[in-house]
Amino acid sequence: VSEPRTWRDAALILRTQKLGETDRIIIMLTRDGGITHAVAKAVRKPTSKFGGRLEPFMHTDLSFSRGRTNLHTITQAATLHAYTAPIMANYDAYTCASTIAELAEALTKDTDSTADIYTLTHGALAALAHGQHVPQRILTRYLARSMNAAGWPLIGENCTRCGNPLTSADSQGDAGAGNAGAGNAPNTAGGSGRYIAFHTAHTYGHHTVLCPQCAPAVDMPLTGLRAEELGYALATASADPRAWATIDVAPVPVASKILGLYLKTAQNLLEHPLKTASALEAEIPAS
């Protein structure tokens, strides 16, 4: 069955590349077709009718003409949601949106299962544009839920080695719960008492949370999690909107630590760095 020469789809613009003197290649996550590359002709001219609708983070309804390769042509563009301006006006929102866009592309470019990632990406960009929550916490929740949708859960209620349930009683005492800024997680799990450990590598098929019984068996750097940190991490992975009640009130050191662990684990699982993560700013406590 031949594919149609023209079609329409809703798209989230992830990034753009210059092409020639007046054109751009638009890299987008589409609702039905996943990652799509298409040429927008003459959009860099001042007289372009829809250049502004094809900026990063825009949510746009597009019409395409199929190309001979995987590079198609955009023929029409209509704005669905204009997220670019409010995101660009807030540096933290912009850097978090850039990492979200990079991660969305990485998670969907080699798979046909993109519906969940599309929905999560749209929700995260909308939340950033509307200023609904701290940008770094929107990114943290996006990391947890998008990686889970891609088959790589970053946190769970069971030990990833033995499968036994984790409880807050497992996170007692000093668990080496240092503060990790964006992409900069501590690699110690010293201290006394029982602790749940977080393992950022994918060594031997195990990563993320380990129970107190399994943690000593893993000969890799670990980071201890206190009960409050585990509770926050589990909230970020929840699909329940009420989880924001827990996420929004968490102390900054807790939120920053979990974001750092998530970023490091995600990059280990993807087996390449997220270039935009280096620009992320640490969350600043409210005065």
List the predicted regions and their residue ranges:
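Non-catalytic alpha-helical scaffolds and adjoining flexible linkers that form interface surfaces
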Residues: V1-R24, L29-S287
